[in-house]
Amino acid sequence: GTGTFTKAGSNTLTLSNSIIFSGPVVINAGSLTMGGDSGLQNSVSLANTSGVILNLGGNDVFVRNLSGGGTSGGNIVLGSGELIIDTVSGSNATFTGVISGTGSVVKKGYGSLTLAAANTYTGGTTISEGSMIVGINNALKSTGAVVVSSTEFNSGSGAVLVIADGFSQTIGTLSGSSG
């Protein structure tokens, strides 16, 4: 569908099949668990509220323009899955929740994504397009692998890891490639 999907109530809602949903997703309370490899084709916003969780259930999930989260809640549990975050060209998304699990994160799209929490996921980070900005000390797990991999090096495109002014980041391994 194309309308806004809002998750309310403290219970867990599990979407049991792979889904492709093109409207915005807002998680205001409780947990939304993905039951299969899925695509949330529009913005995904998590409230800064205790108990608010997007749980990938170990699946690979595509989201666009991730935002929200915070010190009280609004976290993402990867399990062993891969979270693919696409930020549209010209957009600047900020996520302040914690991303945890053994899975990995892939940053796509030519916009920027700022991670503003000390994330604990261990599966590594791949930046294939746009900018991923470290907006807090060690936003990426210090033992994790980071790959900056781009097939385009045109003006204003490509892939970039940015450590924002005043912050530091320890990286387990850093590698890059271009096409």
Q: Where are the regions a protein language model picked out?
A:
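Beta-strand repeat architectures
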Residues: 1-14, 22-93, 100-114, 122-179
